[in-house]
Swiss-Prot record:
<comment type="similarity">
    <text>Belongs to the phycobilisome linker protein family.</text>
</comment>
<feature type="region of interest" description="Disordered">
    <location>
        <begin position="223"/>
        <end position="247"/>
    </location>
</feature>
<keyword id="KW-0472">Membrane</keyword>
<dbReference type="InterPro" id="IPR001297">
    <property type="entry name" value="PBS_linker_dom"/>
</dbReference>
<protein>
    <recommendedName>
        <fullName>Phycobilisome rod-core linker polypeptide CpcG2</fullName>
    </recommendedName>
</protein>
<dbReference type="Pfam" id="PF00427">
    <property type="entry name" value="PBS_linker_poly"/>
</dbReference>
<comment type="function">
    <text>Linker polypeptides determine the state of aggregation and the location of the disk-shaped phycobiliprotein units within the phycobilisome and modulate their spectroscopic properties in order to mediate a directed and optimal energy transfer.</text>
</comment>
<keyword id="KW-0602">Photosynthesis</keyword>
<dbReference type="InterPro" id="IPR038255">
    <property type="entry name" value="PBS_linker_sf"/>
</dbReference>
<dbReference type="InterPro" id="IPR016470">
    <property type="entry name" value="Phycobilisome"/>
</dbReference>
<comment type="subunit">
    <text>Part of the phycobilisome, a hemidiscoidal structure that is composed of two distinct substructures: a core complex and a number of rods radiating from the core.</text>
</comment>
<keyword id="KW-0793">Thylakoid</keyword>
<dbReference type="GO" id="GO:0030089">
    <property type="term" value="C:phycobilisome"/>
</dbReference>
<dbReference type="GO" id="GO:0031676">
    <property type="term" value="C:plasma membrane-derived thylakoid membrane"/>
</dbReference>
<keyword id="KW-0042">Antenna complex</keyword>
<feature type="domain" description="PBS-linker">
    <location>
        <begin position="11"/>
        <end position="189"/>
    </location>
</feature>
<comment type="function">
    <text>Rod-core linker protein required for attachment of phycocyanin to allophycocyanin in cores of phycobilisomes.</text>
</comment>
Amino acid sequence: MSIPLLEYKPSSQNQRVPGYEVPNEDTPRIYRIEDAAYDSELKELIWATYRQVFSEHVILKFFRQGNLESQLKNRAISVRDFVRGLAKSEAFKTLVIKSNSNYRLVELALKRLLGRAPYNKDEEIAWSIKIATNGWDGFVDALLDSEEYQSNFGENIVPYQRRRYKDRPFNLVTPRYGNYWRDKLESERYIEGDIKNFLELAKSIEIKTVTFTPVSTANIKIPDTTRNTTPTGIPISVNPSANFPVR
């Protein structure tokens, strides 16, 4: 039996109140699959979903999910199921899950899947317990099946940062991994020019003593290079235009 989600009190955020801002260049573009009438528009929607879920401006071909893309193009799955598949993919687990703690995974998931930051530490603790009990896949299902996701994005809208006002976009202020993983990578990296590396290298060198083997010249057998026969004929020089007599 899984532990129910702990209660937490939502804090005041922009997306919780209605807005009357005039649309400008900072207003997020909303991608709906109903608006993707052409193949180019569908590709833009797919790329927008990758950018939202992975928060990467460049997606390697190795990390792309061709099976999910094909199902979405054929309308076999909804945008919500496409987002669900990307969040549960091995590529996402390799890039994000393996390099973050549960608390930070909650922050990243709320920003990328629900389009908002965590309300407070209590919400981070509550969702981190959900990850510990139901696993990452269960946590993703809980977010995408929630009333908050359904009421804001439904089945066919790509998630986006809701009501961003003056703040910078989440992808610019929330890198793929935190300070802990960065420091871990730095400690494991070979630092060129560090004197400690030279000292460790010098200590690791094992000097082998050279042993000399005495050799007596009397024991060296010189091969006999004399000939038993006398050469006959006229020797020809290397230069065919000249020759020399035989005495």
